[in-house]
């Protein structure tokens, strides 16, 4: 319903029905909440009223922050009231599982990840208790949340980790099942088909309807949080831990490209001008438009395709081809030799996207979901303009460089310690950076090209790291372990490697070797999220 309204809003908010849209928006966000507030004042134990008001205010909170000139403090007051409503729901009815889920999501949007995870863990424990009460745990099944598995291709990386967790006995026992409701959108149906060997996908309407009542008691949401053994972990941290275990045992990737996809994929490439046997690199640079819509909350993850031209020319000069991935909403590329703008090709298809990700020499990516496909096939990643750093879940074969953050208050770059620690490392929405008065700084064309060169040299067997390079690398890895970059994992360093030249260039941002020296740090007022600044913001775990 919400998605339909947002789509309608995108279509009509600037058209002939603009006035009607804003009238509807005013009524929904200003009048309806007052009606619910009045109802709650008359009936303080009205659970559906609290829940409906909480969801309405959560939507208003998101809408307020999606505008370019948003007021973070005003929006935070709305978000705080939404949080209070969800807290009240689970206080009045501890078995109201949906209340935990929305409360947890609200806490994340307010920058309170620790509390959000605690609430999510409480929800998991309550769910398990209810399943045992009704003996549903004896069925030997678990449902995978369809929100992550179908709506976003990026969330499929957590399905990959979820399946691997089963191998290690780290997830709740049970046959994994994914329900696809009638009319439910699937981002890439062909990629989902590859996972049918590991999970049972059910789309028959009658069967889905019969099983849906069981979902709330037996559902796992690997795109949000995972119970790994006895520890409930934030999804990127869970994936990082599982990927490390998988790599340490030298296990192969779960997916292998089918013979049919291999043959027709190379036939399609030939149509595009790429000779069979040529090597190619895929490139995906996230831009506003595809998922952002009217929202700017993911703006910090975007980058400019023009800053990748130098790296493209480098690949071509070394005998390769570049396949630019994406969709037609993206900025078109100018014509370049041995560069194919597949994002604007009439030959785009879901199966071809899978083929390209599985067959490329490596993928140059930003903080976008396509990396989930390549990772599932074991293809190396070159992660550029990467944020947030808590999502650095990939393997030692992958390289990355993060965006840096400039403190507008102190007129300096954040150190790696600050960048790799909460609250910056766990800031998943643009307004969280705005509140800390941080300007997110994109990688330069030279920095991107240096990282691509490093991967090319590595794959060619020509890469050399000096003793100083290794020392800098270990200092950064140690920093990520000590400061909890992978949130919730104690003394667990990131596994992927930061770009050699990037680290050389910004070595001054590493902790000082001489501990007697001092360096300015962000003050408490700069690092606190607005939710922490308002009175009566009680910890939901105390209720």
Can you name each region flagged by the protein language model?
Residues 49, 99, 132-133:
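TPR alpha-solenoid repeat register
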Residues 39, 88-89, 123:
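Canonical positions in the second alpha-helix
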Residues 226-271, 396-528:
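Leloir-type glycosyltransferase catalytic cores
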Residues 278-291, 305-349, 467-471:
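Catalytic donor nucleotide-activated moiety binding site of glycosyltransferases and closely related
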Residues 160, 353-399:
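A donor-sugar binding/catalytic signature common to diverse glycosyltransferases
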């Amino acid at each position: 319903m919400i998605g339909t309204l947002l789509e309608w809003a995108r279509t009509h908010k600037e058209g002939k029905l603009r006035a009607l849209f804003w009238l509807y928006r005013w009524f929904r966000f200003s009048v309806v909440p007052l009606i619910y507030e009045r109802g709650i004042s008359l009936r303080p134990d009205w659970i559906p009223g609290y829940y409906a008001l909480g969801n309405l205010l959560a939507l208003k909170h998101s809408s307020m922050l999606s505008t370019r000139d948003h007021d973070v403090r005003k929006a935070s007051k709305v978000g705080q009231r939404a949080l209070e409503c969800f807290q009240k729901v689970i206080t009045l009815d501890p078995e109201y599982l949906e209340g935990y889920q929305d409360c947890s999501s609200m806490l994340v949007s307010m920058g309170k990840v620790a509390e959000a995870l605690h609430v999510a863990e409480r929800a998991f424990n309550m769910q398990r208790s209810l399943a045992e009460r009704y003996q549903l745990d004896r069925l030997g099944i678990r449902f995978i949340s369809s929100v992550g598995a179908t709506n976003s291709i990026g969330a499929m990386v957590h399905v990959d980790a979820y399946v691997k967790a089963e191998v290690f006995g780290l997830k709740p026992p049970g046959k994994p099942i994914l329900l696809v409701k009638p009319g439910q959108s699937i981002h890439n149906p062909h990629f989902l088909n590859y996972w049918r060997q590991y999970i049972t996908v059910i789309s028959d309407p009658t069967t889905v309807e019969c099983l849906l009542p069981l979902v709330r008691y037996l559902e796992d949401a690997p795109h949000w949080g995972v119970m790994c053994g006895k520890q409930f972990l934030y999804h990127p941290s869970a994936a990082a831990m599982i990927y490390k275990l998988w790599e340490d045992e030298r296990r192969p990737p779960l997916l292998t490209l089918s013979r049919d996809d291999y043959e027709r994929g190379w036939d399609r490439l030939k149509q595009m001008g790429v000779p069979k046997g040529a090597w190619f690199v895929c490139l995906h640079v996230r831009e506003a438009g595809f998922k952002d819509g009217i929202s700017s909350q993911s703006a910090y993850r975007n980058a400019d395709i023009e800053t990748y031209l130098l790296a493209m020319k480098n690949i071509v000069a070394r005998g390769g081809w570049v396949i630019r991935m994406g969709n037609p909403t993206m900025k078109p590329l100018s014509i370049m030799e041995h560069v194919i703008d597949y994002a604007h090709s009439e030959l785009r298809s879901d199966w071809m996207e899978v083929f390209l990700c599985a067959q490329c020499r490596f993928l140059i990516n930003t903080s976008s979901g396509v990396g989930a496909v390549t990772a599932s096939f074991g293809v190396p990643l070159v992660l550029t303009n990467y944020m947030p750093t808590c999502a650095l879940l990939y393997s030692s074969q992958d390289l990355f460089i993060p965006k840096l953050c400039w403190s507008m208050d102190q007129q300096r770059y954040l150190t790696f310690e600050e960048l790799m620690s909460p609250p910056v490392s766990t800031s998943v929405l643009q307004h969280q950076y705005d509140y800390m008065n941080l300007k997110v700084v994109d990688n330069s064309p030279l920095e991107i090209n240096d990282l691509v060169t490093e991967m090319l040299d590595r794959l060619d067997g020509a890469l050399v790291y000096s003793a100083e390079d290794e020392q800098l690398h270990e200092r950064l890895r140690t920093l990520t372990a000590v400061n909890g970059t992978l949130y919730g994992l104690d003394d667990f360093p990131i596994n992927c490697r930061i770009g050699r030249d990037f680290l050389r260039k910004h070595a001054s941002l590493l902790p000082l070797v001489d501990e007697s020296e001092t360096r300015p740090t962000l003050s408490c007022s700069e690092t606190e999220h607005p939710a922490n600044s308002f009175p009566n913001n009680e910890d939901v775990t105390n209720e």
